[in-house]
Amino acid sequence: GANAAPQGQGKVTFNGTVVDAPCGIDAQSADQSIEFGQVSKVLLNNGGSSTPKNFDIKLTDCDVTNYKKAGKAGTVSLTFSGVQAGTDMLQTVGTTGTAILVKDPHGKAVKFDGATATGVSSLVDGDNTIHFTALVKKDTSGNDVAEGAFSAVANFNLIYQ
């Protein structure tokens, strides 16, 4: 019999990076989106904040035992980078006058300067989850919050100790 002609085609691309680290990072944690939905302008203008949104960074297949044998503490902290709003918020893109406040697992505000590390989290063998909380607030410009869409991007780096 004759071979059937193709009726559509496509492509699958596989990417990854091998790192010298005691843990891998879950693919969903490496690139995630947090949806705040609709946030009240009046609430933000009066100094309030949105409902907190929790997000996690999941580390996978950690081999902490061998890492500690090399004289390491077996802990991790993170640095975040992005467009700063004041000293401890992430400026949003758009004209809403909003910023994102992120708190680390210890309840401390994350700095988006790419250098100041979050609090340290101890690691165990296997999978580890680091919990964060994000809130929308009025930014530090002094202007009132305006209606419209907002977004912000922060990049993070893991620092193993």
Curated annotation (Swiss-Prot):
GO biological process entries: cell adhesion involved in single-species biofilm formation
Keywords: Fimbrium, Secreted
InterPro entries: Adhesion_dom_fimbrial, Adhesion_dom_fimbrial_sf, Adhesion_dom_sf, Bact_Fimbrial_Adh_Pro
Secreted recorded as keyword: yes
Subcellular location: Secreted; Fimbrium
This protein's GO CC annotations: extracellular region; pilus
Role, per record: Fimbriae (also called pili), polar filaments radiating from the surface of the bacterium to a length of 0.5-1.5 micrometers and numbering 100-300 per cell, enable bacteria to colonize the epithelium of specific host organs.
Entry similarity comment: Belongs to the fimbrial protein family.
UniProt-recorded name of the protein: PRS fimbrial major pilin protein
